Structure formats: C-alpha cells, structure tokens
Amino acid sequence: MRLVLATRNAAKLEELRRILAPIVPVEVLGLGDLPAYPEVPETGATFEENALIKAREAAARTGLPAVADDSGLAVDALNGMPGVLSARWSGHGATDERNLRLVLEQVEDVPDERRGAAFVCAAVLVTPAGVERVAQGTVTGTLLRAPRGSNGFGYDPIFRPAGETRTTAEMSAAEKDAISHRGKAFRSLAPLVASALA
C-alpha cells in the first residue's frame, strides 16, 4: 500500500517516516516524489484546517490516501502566536533561523517564569473515498533565551520540554520522536491509518 505525505519538508518527511514505519507497513511518498505538484496555500485558521486542506488536495490529485500535518509553536507571552504562522513568522522568505530570532526578540523582556510555550500538531488522514481522520499532539515547555543544540529543525533549539534539561535540538531523533507533538499526533493517527487502509 502506498500513502502520500503532503509535505516537501525533508526533515519533517524523515521524522514522520520514522514514526509511521514501525506502526503502519506502507510505502510513504513525499510531494517531492510526485511530478509537478503545486504549492497548496495554507489558508486555515487552525492547525487542523491547514492539515485537512493539504491532505484533501493530495488525495484528490494522486488518488492515494494522504496524510498531512500542520504544526507550530504557540508562545504564551505572544497569545499563542506564531501558531499557524510558525513557518512564515518572519515574513516573505522566512527561514528557520529568522523565525527563531524573531521569536527570541519578541520575548526578550519576558521573565523566565512567563516563557511558557507549546508545540502543537494536528495530523490528518484523507482517503480518496472521503474518509477523514484527525489526531492531535501537544508538548509543553519553556522558551530559552538562546539557541542550544544542532539536531531537529525550526524552533527546536530554543524549546525545552517540561521536565527536561535539554532542548529538543539537543535530543537524538529517537528521544525527540518519543515526546514530540508530531510523534504524539502521528502515533495516535497510525492506528486510524491502519484501520482506514485495511
């Protein structure tokens, strides 16, 4: 069985393949594996809406079951932002580095005890027959004042999960997968994928 994962993000694709591989025996294709796949605008107001937009489009275009996620960082001191704008927080041409620096600038004067944040993920499955399944995952933690670690991507170098002394960028891939928002969402989605594809 083949499944398309509606992302071009190589780091995310690898992370999601690692998480799904032991649970659901399917060949996972990314959008980069498909010819001339267009960009799909993420116009939703929530992570779930954006994930459904991407998965519905991928299922319709490929005729394959499609999985998509939308995830981001919700910072308490920024009223839950950058949220669904996490990947493009620093504007046109946003990069992980620019986004991370902007968040650090925006919370620079926030005291340590008020630097709470959460990584949030909505993961969805959409089949060509119209079956839709949704799973959510969240990991809470604290924003550091400076980046630490070189693993992971995005805001990982400034996010320390609750109960941890390390950032998610200081963890191995297996350690991060075990606690991450995406790991939680996709482990919850995996049995739904298995039953929908049975």
Segments (PLM) and residue ranges:
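Anionic-ligand binding patches
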Residues: M1-V4, A10-A198
